[in-house]
Structures are given as structure tokens and as C-alpha cells.
Amino acid sequence: MNKRGALLSLLFLSASVSAFAASTESKSVKFPQCEGLDAAGIAASVKRDYQQNRIVRWADDQKKVGQADPVAWVNVQDVVGQNDKWTVPLTVRGKSADIHYQVIVDCKAGKAEYKPR
């Protein structure tokens, strides 16, 4: 009986660690054309990209926030960047929880990385 309990405990611990690791990994994605945009334009592009492209594909985000159409926003004053490389703090609010991302956008490369924060 003790072996079974220890095995179940180990299995549960392993699953918990895997779930935590999955939720803290960054996600690299293709990003639409954004060269020459200012901070407000980049903020709008990141918000639009998340709402139209990411939330529909990232089931773990839908599950965490508790809905398929959460509210996403960016405070433009917190957007920093130069030479078409930007750091954008994104907040996603749903029924169950909030998700916070630091989105690193490289306009020249056409890529973005969503890092949980």
C-alpha cells in the first residue's frame, strides 16, 4: 500500500511540475508587419495579434482565463523600444484569472516572443 501511495504522489508531483513549466515558457510567433510604427501603433498591433491570432490557438490561455474572448490591454506609456524592436507589457483579463505577458517584438524579423511575467 505504501508503494502505491508513493507512486501516486510522485506521479502527481511530476504532473504539477510539468503544468507549471508549461505555463512559464515563452512562446515565439510570427508577427505582422510593424516597421516604422510608434509606441501606440505597436501597442495596438500586439493587442490585435493576441486577440485575433493567439487566444484562438492557445487553449491553455483560454482555460486559464475561463473564456475564449478575454479583454486584452496595453498601457502605451509602458511600451519601450527603438530601431523597430519593442518591449510591450500585455495584460489579458478573463472570468477566472489574469495573464500578464512581456511581449518582445522584432519588427524587422517579423517575430514576437510572449513571455509570462
UniProtKB/Swiss-Prot annotation:
Its main location: secreted. NCBIfam families: PRK13680.1, YebF_not_Cmi. It comes from Salmonella typhimurium (strain LT2 / SGSC1412 / ATCC 700720). GO terms for cellular component: extracellular region. Residues 30-117 form the YebF/Cmi domain. Residues 1-21 form the signal peptide. This is Protein YebF. It is found in: Secreted. Keywords: Disulfide bond, Secreted, Signal. Disulfide bonds join C34-C107. Belongs to the YebF family.
